[in-house]
Amino acid sequence: MNQVNQDTTVSTLPKWLKLTDEGVTVTLKYKTVISGVMTDALTMRAPSVMDWRASKVAGNGDFEKQELSLFGSLVGLTEAELLTLKYKDYQRLSAGYFRLVDEDDV
């Protein structure tokens, strides 16, 4: 009898996260109004080194402010708009961001 070994470490994405070549789309748990429009999903582009450096300057040593600046830039929202998101949806954005910047093969 031959035994077949299957690699079960393949990571699957949650149904609320869609990965593309250019970024991720995050489906929100709670719809929110952005610029007067009811929104149920946000698209985050992949960050560049310039994005990261600009957010570091904007944060001026404050990690939370740096993250808000970076996420706002990548999603196209102001800090005030990001702050209106429910925490669960902000965590989804964060998960999407780390999916973009972490190595797939590590």
Predicted feature locations:
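Short, surface-exposed, charged amphipathic helix/loop patches that serve as local interaction elements
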Residues: 2-106
